[in-house]
From Swiss-Prot:
Tissue occurrence: This is one of two isocytochromes C found in the testis. The other is identical with the form found in other rat tissues. These cytochromes are assumed to be located in the sperm.
Name of this protein: Cytochrome c, testis-specific
Gene3D superfamilies: Cytochrome c-like domain
The entry's keywords: Acetylation, Apoptosis, Electron transport, Heme, Iron, Metal-binding, Mitochondrion, Phosphoprotein, Respiratory chain, Transport
Residues modified to N-acetylglycine: G2
Gene Ontology CC annotation, any one: mitochondrial intermembrane space
Length: 105
């Protein structure tokens, strides 16, 4: 799939202001992403989500993240994530590869 090293750079540029990835990492404006894959939307313990996120009921996978990261507000109308999305498929693939490695043991 993607290139995790390139994905890490994308994460630092576009995501790290609001998210952490390490186990036990703190929530910032957005939730800590440890354990993201296989988790339902709106379920990171201790983070205050919008009803839209909690009610979406989707499991985060490579496929759902590909769609979400292209246009978050279209995928989950009512999300408080203020991020326009990543239009380039290759950049989304790189970011997802990085997240797969960085958010699990």
């Amino acid at each position: 799939m993607g290139d995790a090293e390139a994905g890490k750079k994308i994460f630092i540029q576009k995501c790290a202001q609001c998210h952490t990835v390490e186990k036990g990492g703190k929530h910032k404006t957005g939730p800590n992403l440890w354990g993201l894959f296989g988790r339902k939307t709106g379920q990171a313990p201790g983070f205050s989500y919008t009803d839209a996120n909690k009610n979406k009921g989707v499991i985060w996978t490579e496929e759902t993240l590909m769609e979400y990261l292209e246009n978050p507000k279209k995928y989950i109308p009512g999300t408080k994530m203020i991020f326009a999305g990543i239009k380039k498929k290759s950049e989304r693939e790189d970011l997802i590869q990085y997240l797969k490695e960085a958010t699990s043991s």
